[in-house]
Amino acid sequence: MKENYNYPLDLSWSTTEMTEVLSFFNQVEKFYESKVEKELFLESYAAFKKVVPSKMQEKQLGRDFEQSSGYSLYRALKEVEASGKRFVSADKA
């Protein structure tokens, strides 16, 4: 993880929308740094998708987030979705 990185946010989003997106980014960070509860991660992703319904924008945000943090949204999502466990982490997914 890189120290002191910025989150890729769209300034046209409302405060609530930014909170939803940040919540998902936090879940991704938690996936890499400790572990996440699968259900909560997927709920957070669903809320993120309501704010960012476009696949293209999701990929761009994912690339920007990975460049600044070193964490892949795509990899985290795929590993959590594929896991049959209640709690999932990057090193045990």
Swiss-Prot record:
Pfam families: UPF0223 (PF05256)
Family designation: Belongs to the UPF0223 family.
Source species, domain of life: Bacteria
The organism's taxonomic lineage, starting at the top: Bacteria, Bacillati, Bacillota, Bacilli, Lactobacillales
Protein name listed in UniProt: UPF0223 protein llmg_0515
